[in-house]
């Protein structure tokens, strides 16, 4: 049963781009995307604070679900919609502070054991990856493939789930067919020859998410 320890999110979050700049946040919100993540890696809080503030303000303006990757203190300070954490970040994060601030929490997983860890935290949603080989970040684990993804989605039947990792426009329909509630994309949009067209096509497949 879906009873998160954090505020709930819709079962279907729809198309969920993960981007590294405020410029991309603004572009995609303007293109109709309503679930996004700002993921800026390996910089100090004070270096990214202005970007976090700007992204959160844009999210509010468009009434969107904007998650901040990793920088949970800044997300709390500036009242983001939510925070996304990797497995390696869970232990070093004050989950009670995120909960007390009323922020949603998403957690990355790569196998059944990590799903167990995520479920113990009772987050708002669980990300399942990486589905296919990905160039976006170095991954110590092997790609799960569609069959494994479908098994995880079935296990988490009533939990909001997000598929991530190598999800392209061509692969997106098969990923959605597993029953997963959302697809997270990176290069499928940011490296597309025509990002507006790619975004529109992906929105047609994955939707904007439930209210």
From Swiss-Prot:
<comment type="function">
    <text>Condenses 4-methyl-5-(beta-hydroxyethyl)thiazole monophosphate (THZ-P) and 2-methyl-4-amino-5-hydroxymethyl pyrimidine pyrophosphate (HMP-PP) to form thiamine monophosphate (TMP).</text>
</comment>
<dbReference type="InterPro" id="IPR022998">
    <property type="entry name" value="ThiamineP_synth_TenI"/>
</dbReference>
<feature type="binding site">
    <location>
        <position position="89"/>
    </location>
    <ligand>
        <name>Mg(2+)</name>
    </ligand>
</feature>
<keyword id="KW-0808">Transferase</keyword>
<feature type="binding site">
    <location>
        <position position="108"/>
    </location>
    <ligand>
        <name>4-amino-2-methyl-5-(diphosphooxymethyl)pyrimidine</name>
    </ligand>
</feature>
<feature type="binding site">
    <location>
        <position position="69"/>
    </location>
    <ligand>
        <name>4-amino-2-methyl-5-(diphosphooxymethyl)pyrimidine</name>
    </ligand>
</feature>
<keyword id="KW-0784">Thiamine biosynthesis</keyword>
<feature type="binding site">
    <location>
        <begin position="186"/>
        <end position="187"/>
    </location>
    <ligand>
        <name>2-[(2R,5Z)-2-carboxy-4-methylthiazol-5(2H)-ylidene]ethyl phosphate</name>
    </ligand>
</feature>
<feature type="binding site">
    <location>
        <position position="137"/>
    </location>
    <ligand>
        <name>4-amino-2-methyl-5-(diphosphooxymethyl)pyrimidine</name>
    </ligand>
</feature>
<feature type="binding site">
    <location>
        <position position="70"/>
    </location>
    <ligand>
        <name>Mg(2+)</name>
    </ligand>
</feature>
<dbReference type="GO" id="GO:0000287">
    <property type="term" value="F:magnesium ion binding"/>
</dbReference>
<comment type="pathway">
    <text>Cofactor biosynthesis; thiamine diphosphate biosynthesis; thiamine phosphate from 4-amino-2-methyl-5-diphosphomethylpyrimidine and 4-methyl-5-(2-phosphoethyl)-thiazole: step 1/1.</text>
</comment>
<feature type="binding site">
    <location>
        <position position="166"/>
    </location>
    <ligand>
        <name>2-[(2R,5Z)-2-carboxy-4-methylthiazol-5(2H)-ylidene]ethyl phosphate</name>
    </ligand>
</feature>
<protein>
    <recommendedName>
        <fullName>Thiamine-phosphate synthase</fullName>
        <ecNumber>2.5.1.3</ecNumber>
    </recommendedName>
</protein>
<dbReference type="InterPro" id="IPR034291">
    <property type="entry name" value="TMP_synthase"/>
</dbReference>
<feature type="binding site">
    <location>
        <begin position="37"/>
        <end position="41"/>
    </location>
    <ligand>
        <name>4-amino-2-methyl-5-(diphosphooxymethyl)pyrimidine</name>
    </ligand>
</feature>
<dbReference type="GO" id="GO:0009228">
    <property type="term" value="P:thiamine biosynthetic process"/>
</dbReference>
<feature type="binding site">
    <location>
        <begin position="134"/>
        <end position="136"/>
    </location>
    <ligand>
        <name>2-[(2R,5Z)-2-carboxy-4-methylthiazol-5(2H)-ylidene]ethyl phosphate</name>
    </ligand>
</feature>
<keyword id="KW-0460">Magnesium</keyword>
<dbReference type="GO" id="GO:0009229">
    <property type="term" value="P:thiamine diphosphate biosynthetic process"/>
</dbReference>
<dbReference type="InterPro" id="IPR013785">
    <property type="entry name" value="Aldolase_TIM"/>
</dbReference>
<dbReference type="GO" id="GO:0004789">
    <property type="term" value="F:thiamine-phosphate diphosphorylase activity"/>
</dbReference>
<keyword id="KW-0479">Metal-binding</keyword>
<dbReference type="Pfam" id="PF02581">
    <property type="entry name" value="TMP-TENI"/>
</dbReference>
<dbReference type="GO" id="GO:0005737">
    <property type="term" value="C:cytoplasm"/>
</dbReference>
<comment type="similarity">
    <text>Belongs to the thiamine-phosphate synthase family.</text>
</comment>
<dbReference type="InterPro" id="IPR036206">
    <property type="entry name" value="ThiamineP_synth_sf"/>
</dbReference>
């Amino acid at each position: 049963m879906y009873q998160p320890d954090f505020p709930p999110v819709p079962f279907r979050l729809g198309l969920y781009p993960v981007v590294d700049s405020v410029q991309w946040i603004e572009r995609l919100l303007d293109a109709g995307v309503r679930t996004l993540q700002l993921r800026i890696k390996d910089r100090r809080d004070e270096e990214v604070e202005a970007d976090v503030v700007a992204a959160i303000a844009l999210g509010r303006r468009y009434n969107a679900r904007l998650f901040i990757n990793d920088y949970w203190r800044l997300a709390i300070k500036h009242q983001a919609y939510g925070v996304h954490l990797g497995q390696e970040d869970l232990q070093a994060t004050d989950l009670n502070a995120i909960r007390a601030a009323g922020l949603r929490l998403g957690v990355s997983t790569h196998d059944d054991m990590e799903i167990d860890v995520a479920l113990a935290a009772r987050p708002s949603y669980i990300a399942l990856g990486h589905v296919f080989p990905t160039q976006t970040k170095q991954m110590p684990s092997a790609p799960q493939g569609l069959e494994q993804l479908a098994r995880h989605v079935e296990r988490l039947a009533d939990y909001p789930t997000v598929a991530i990792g190598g999800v392209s426009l061509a692969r997106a329909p098969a990923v959605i067919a597993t029953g997963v509630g959302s697809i997270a994309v990176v290069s499928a949009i940011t490296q597309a020859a025509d990002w507006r067209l790619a975004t529109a096509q992906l929105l047609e497949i994955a939707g904007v998410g439930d209210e």
